[in-house]
């Protein structure tokens, strides 16, 4: 079993939904939690609710300068959990290129940017825990899920490649593939 007490975990994409819930869980387990997202107000409110030492650092995963500033401000961590996500439901018949591009940029390319700034330090220290949030949709295409499913297939593949490259080091890589969780993102669905 993992010992969380005294560990520093950075949750990126933690202002709501799964990230917010995980911040509470890790806090109850004794971890020092650093939460990040774009919304400073939501992050500040979350930090005030957490039961242990917690702080926040704003980050925009679409902006490499914002990522680099956040990495510098946060400093070395025992673990990083990438939960940042964007979602708009639409399918091939009503293609929305701007939304598709944003989903891929936040969900996949943002992950690549963050890992590029975090992983080298973990490899140098031969220590770290990386958790990447993908989705069950990464395994099979779904109606009205063009950009999201493609981006999550990419996050799954990236996580598997990182695990293959780092499995014999002190850096542990995990991927989680949640099913349907009701969040502000999934509330956009109009299931029939």
Regions found by a protein language model. Give the residues of each.
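Conserved glycine-rich Rossmann-like NAD(P)H-binding loop of the short-chain dehydrogenase/reductase
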Residues: 29-46
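Conserved glycine-rich cofactor-binding loop
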Residues: 15-16
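Active-site loop immediately N-terminal to the catalytic Tyr-X3-Lys motif
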Residues: 93, 142-146, 189
